[in-house]
A protein has these predicted regions:
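Conserved pre-catalytic core of RNA-dependent polymerases
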Residues: 1-119
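Active-site palm subdomain of RNA-directed nucleic acid polymerases
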Residues: 7-25, 55, 126-158
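Hydrophobic alpha-helical membrane-association signature
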Residues: 37, 41, 128-132, 169-173
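Eukaryotic intrinsically disordered and solvent-exposed regulatory patches
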Residues: 42-45, 138-139, 182
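Short, charged alpha-helical motifs in flexible N/C-terminal segments and linkers
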Residues: 46-54, 178-196, 203
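Catalytic palm subdomain of template-directed nucleic-acid polymerases
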Residues: 64-81, 152-182
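Short, conserved phosphate/pyrophosphate- and ester-handling motifs at nucleotide-, phospho-/glycolipid
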Residues: 121, 125
């Protein structure tokens, strides 16, 4: 536990001091919190609505994120951020030294190596999760705000003629997010992912079902 704490502190110091974590990440980041993210949304969205514009937002939730971070992918990402050498080897050993067994009708299976997930309760879990999720927002057209593994994609609609372009660009970003999840063996929980339609002009019709269309 002491060794894990020292390494977690060193990794966080390296990542944050070199600006390697997304500016839109509010989870497990010094000086950032859930409240900061909510205040940012409140300020931005009130300004947009006061200007008589509209907002489309998509909130996404990764299914069991702490349990599904794929170890080979995580190690690849750590290396790409400059965490290499002996530290990288130590982390590889740390991730590979866990096994799981299943008991059924009083019979215990043989041990099976755990190949995904970060150890629950470990002080390393939050920072490793941050590294894994960090590149999700790369190459997107719209800002993706992150609270650890929860994310929100936003687009402002300034006039009705922007509606189709907004839908197309959000679809394009969802395609990129889907590609990211396929590449890194992750999945999003449709029951906890939602579209949001904010307008000062209500009442208004049913918003486009972006998520249901995306998953079809």
């Amino acid at each position: 536990m002491i060794m894990e704490s020292i390494i977690a502190t060193d990794i966080k110091s390296f990542l944050f001091s070199n600006g390697l974590i997304s500016d839109h990440q509010f989870g497990f980041r010094p000086g950032h919190s859930t409240l900061d993210m909510l205040l940012l949304f409140s300020k931005q969205w009130v300004e947009v609505l006061n200007a008589r514009h509209e907002i489309r937002a998509i909130s996404l939730d990764i299914s069991s994120a702490f349990d599904t971070d794929w170890h080979p992918a995580l190690l690849t990402k750590l290396s790409s951020y400059g965490i290499q050498g002996h530290l990288h080897s130590w982390l590889a050993e740390f991730l590979s030294c866990h096994n799981q067994r299943v008991a059924l009708n009083g019979v215990l299976s043989s041990p099976h190596p755990v190949q995904a997930g970060v150890p629950q309760g470990s002080v390393l879990a939050p920072v490793l999760s941050l590294v894994f999720i960090n590149d999700l927002s790369d190459s997107l057209q719209h800002p993706l705000y992150l609270l650890d593994d929860d994310s929100t994609l936003c687009r402002t609609i300034c006039n009705p003629s922007d509606e189709q372009a907004a839908a197309s660009s959000l679809f394009a970003d969802l395609d990129k997010i889907t590609s990211w999840s396929n590449t890194w063996n992750m999945s999003f929980n449709p029951d906890k992912s939602h579209t949001h339609y904010l307008s000062p002009k209500g009442p208004f019709g049913t918003p486009p079902h972006l998520l249901s269309q995306q998953s079809s």
